[in-house]
Swiss-Prot record:
Disulfide bonds, paired cysteine numbers: none
Lineage: Bacteria, Pseudomonadati, Chlorobiota, Chlorobiia, Chlorobiales
Keywords, ordered alphabetically: Ribonucleoprotein, Ribosomal protein
Annotated function: This protein is located at the 30S-50S ribosomal subunit interface and may play a role in the structure and function of the aminoacyl-tRNA binding site.
Protein name: Large ribosomal subunit protein bL19
Organism (species): Chlorobium phaeovibrioides (strain DSM 265 / 1930)
PROSITE patterns xref list: RIBOSOMAL_L19
GO molecular function, one term: structural constituent of ribosome
Keyword Ribosomal protein found: yes
GO BP term, example: translation
Family statement: Belongs to the bacterial ribosomal protein bL19 family.
GO CC annotations on file: cytosolic large ribosomal subunit
One Pfam family hit: Ribosomal_L19
Gene: rplS
Keyword Ribosomal protein assigned: yes
Alphabetized InterPro entries for the sequence: Ribosomal_bL19 (IPR001857), Ribosomal_bL19_CS (IPR018257), Ribosomal_bL19_sf (IPR038657), Translation_prot_SH3-like_sf (IPR008991)
Length: 121
C-alpha cells in the first residue's frame, strides 16, 4: 500500500504550487461542470487554514459574498483546480485564523500585509 501511495505522490511531484500561508489573499480558478458545459469559476478569499502536506494539502478559503460568509475547503492538487494565484501576502500570528469568522464587514477580511521579496528566476 505504501508503494502505491509513493507512486501517486511521485506523479504529482512535478506540479508547481505557490507558497500559500494563512492570511494570504488568493484567487483560485476552479473547473465547474454544468451539464455538458465546462467553465472556470474564480473564488477569491483569505486563507484561514492550511492542512496536510504534499498531495494531501488542503486550504480553507473564506470570502464574504452579499454579506454572507462563504468558506470552501480546497484540495490544492485536485484536478478541478486550474490555478492558484496569491494576490496579497498576509501577516498572521496564528496558524488558524478562525477568529475571522466572528468579524463582520471589512474587518472580516483585514489581515496585515507581509512584504515578500521577489524570487530571482
Amino acid at each position: 500500500m505504501d508503494q502505491l501511495i509513493q507512486l501517486v505522490e511521485a506523479t504529482q511531484a512535478g506540479v508547481e504550487t505557490p507558497d500559500i500561508y494563512p492570511g494570504d489573499s488568493v484567487r483560485i480558478q476552479l473547473r465547474v461542470i454544468e451539464g455538458e458545459k465546462e467553465r472556470l469559476q474564480a473564488f477569491d478569499g483569505v486563507v484561514i487554514s492550511d492542512r496536510g502536506a504534499g498531495t494531501n494539502k488542503t486550504i480553507t478559503v473564506r470570502k464574504i459574498s452579499h454579506g454572507v460568509g462563504v468558506e470552501r475547503i480546497i484540495p490544492i492538487n485536485s484536478p478541478n483546480v486550474e490555478s492558484v494565484t496569491v494576490l496579497k501576502h498576509g501577516k498572521a500570528r496564528r496558524s488558524k485564523l478562525f477568529y475571522l469568522r466572528k468579524r463582520t464587514g471589512k474587518a472580516a477580511l483585514k489581515v496585515k500585509e507581509r512584504k515578500v521579496a521577489e524570487k530571482a528566476s
